[in-house]
Amino acid sequence: MSYKLVIAEKPSVAQSIAKVIGADKREDGYLEGNGYIVSWCVGHLVELASPEFYDEKYEKWRYEDLPILPSEWNYQIAEATRKQFGILKKLMEREDVTGLVEATDAGREGELIFRLVYDQAKCKKPFERLWISSMEDQAISDGFFHLKNGREYDDLYRAALCRERADWIVGMNATRLFLTDTNRRRTAVKPMTVFLFRQVFKKSLSCEYNRSGRKVISYIGCNFFMNSIDKKTW
């Protein structure tokens, strides 16, 4: 009997999918049944290597070593989720698994999570894409009836890679630059203070500017009136 390996983004989603497609036999790290094996990632199982992976000199944060710009990108298995990656890799290598279903979240990050696992495991088996925005039973059933060719989302994967690598370049360099330059200039900031720059930081700063800064800049003064009642007239 041949199987399709379905990979979801998190265990709760995998369980919802397994219930609909009839994979009801629970194993260590996956569910199996009715011609399907359903397993899951736990967030990002594969992540970009840290700077010291490229060169040991980056273990020490030095202003003179910046910027850090890898000529090629390397990835590593996240230590906290290494076991689950191993389970997925073994499932991909099973001879009775003839294809995969990418069931991670329908979006850029979901695409990245699956593809990095797929590539890191050196899997060459064909895969289809489950693209749904609801976890209702009917939506899951309809989604499996209309599975897409996984390669139709190659551009989305490339966009996710660009976002991830840009985030790494900005985050790693800006964090080290701010800390080393601050300490180098002997400002009042404590030596062990660490400022982490990431996309979330930039997005938050942008939101605050849009909410507060632009309102101040575009503010136009105007007259206003207040009503009052003289109690003596009653």
Where are the regions a protein language model picked out?
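Intrinsically disordered, low-complexity regulatory segments
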Residues: 1-181, 195-196, 222-228
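Amphipathic alpha-helical surface "interface" segments used
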Residues: 164-167, 186-190
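Short, solvent-exposed helix-loop connector elements
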Residues: 178-189, 209, 213
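Conserved catalytic-core segments of large NTP-driven translation/proteostasis enzymes
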Residues: 190-191, 201
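N-terminal cationic and glycine-rich segments that engage phosphates or anionic surfaces
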Residues: 198-234
